[in-house]
Amino acid sequence: FGTEVRDAETVLAALRFTDATDIVGIPAGSGAANTGVLAFADYDGDGDRDLFVGGRLLQNEITGFVDVTQVAGLASGQPSAALFGDYDNDGFLDLYVAADGEGRLYRNARDGSFSDVTSSLGLSVPAGAPLFLDFDQDGDLDLSVSGASGGFLLRNNLDGSFTDVTSRAGIGNAGAGGSMAFGDFDDDDDIDFVVSADGRQARVYDNERLGRFAARPEGLGSYAAGTGISSVGDYNNDGFLDVLVAPRGGRAVELYLNESGTTFGADDRPTALLASARDFDVHDAAFIDFDNDGWLDVLLVGESGDEGVIRLFRNAAAGQFDDVSDLLPDVPPLRRIATGDFGDDGDLDIFVSTADGAARLLRNDGGNANRYLKMQLVGLSTGSGKNNHFGLGAKLEVRAGGLYQTRVVTGPDIHIGLGQHARADVVRVRWPNGVPQNLFYPGANQSVVEEQILKGSCPFLYTWDGEAFTFVTDLMWKSALGMP
């Protein structure tokens, strides 16, 4: 698909990332080794984004960030992972923390504090990389954890309790020590996994419904030492979610194109990006549209010896990625990435965590030369209740002139680059339950809260077989925007 954007050289010439850590008042690190845990979200509902980094909860106040860990009721420790997610569907973000060999689930009390509900819910939560998602499409967020002994899947029972369904789901042997990401890779309106693990290739697990997943036979990544990190995004704007694989041990990054939802093929065109990680260990990777041109770029962080490494590659929209890492400041060894519009100025800033439990803000100055649209979804708590509050797992399709792009909703905040378009022609939300909802002609450079509209059940198609009417299919309007 084509795109109409301001000349890239003009945008990039005026764009820089500035280390604004001291300016916004982020305190120094905890000093604990290897606590580069990072989560970024508005947990207190006051409209600005807060941080959980290195085991500390930092509340965003007018004068800077304040350490409220003890006041908020969070335990101290040596965390290895953390993630915000609204497991009880009340519109306030709860928190999972992996520390000291176990996982703890904290419920947001809506007053700035959290309560540890792990025991009261009867949870036996492993420590590992967490993922909140609604894999069974019943309207609440389940919890997946990639732990030291393999993958775990805990189903939310709609009443606040969880059931371990790992064995039935078939992901227990997915591998240990890596990470998980989700998306609807085959475009059949359910949530699939991609699992990265130590000692094996990354692998896609297709959702077969009824709580079961099946591993695709082909692996992603060519290294037996393991893939470590994977990231999901439609980087070629064809409507299907692709996968970036970042192996451990200073080996090349790999990109896999989703070929119409059926198979993944290695994309060897972006040579600069593919060779980029050979000289450092990648600890995290993310897709990010840093210049608002509607094409997903790639961000990598890690270390080489005692030196930090951060690399940024701009998607040139023609199968190539240009190395624009000179737009970034020097950094210490880094562990994790979180992106979002911290400055609320229309472009995506970058938070990174360091090995000693500190966070740094790399402020995007100039990415808003192109236009944008920010969205937040709100699922209905009435009616069928089949969509979680923030719409995690929904698919967004956006068309603006010749620019078409797809985004999978993985958190409350959705950022869409529009290039130089003054508006989008249409934004289609396909909610996690498969029901579509269209927003026509939203103007650029604004934030939109899109609430789910209660609709009747979808129409069904029956055919007469000579003796009786037989069911053919439901009509869920699954074609991409602008396509038959």
Predicted features along the sequence, with ranges:
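Short glycine/acidic-enriched loop and turn motifs that connect beta-strands
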Residues: 102, 150, 200, 249-251, ...
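Blade-edge motifs of beta-propeller repeat domains
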Residues: 2-33, 59-77, 107-125, 155-175, ...
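Beta-strand-rich domains and repeat architectures in extracellular enzymes and scaffolds
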Residues: 24-53
